[in-house]
Amino acid sequence: MCIRDRLIQLGKNMEVVSRARIEIEAMRLMVLRAAKAMDVLGNAEARIWVSAVKAMVPEKCCDIINEAIQMHGAAGISQWYPLADMWHSQRTLRLADGPDEVHHHVVARAEVRNREAAVSAGEGLNYALGGPYAD
């Protein structure tokens, strides 16, 4: 690596940035979907979407920050960049709002319950294509 090379031009760093942007947009859409569910269905029914957001967003943020740390190498965990502090804060948030497993359990339990109801109603594959709150 030449000292003049820009970090973005090395290896798969362009792909890492692309994946990060796509994941950030997916997280934003998921938060918007949870907010819409709160407005339309009410807080009690929207708790499944809220749990999904609480599980997904901090987890994906940690992944994105981790990729940035990898991209920067040893400098990524130094005090030259805020990445180590960002990762630490996001990892703490994953525990502060309840373990990820609890949020995943809420989503999975609702998914199984909705799937069983769809099968007993004869909807079968239609449920798999749209989910319980499909537009």
Per-segment meaning from a language model:
Residues 3-135:
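Alpha-helical interface subdomain recognition
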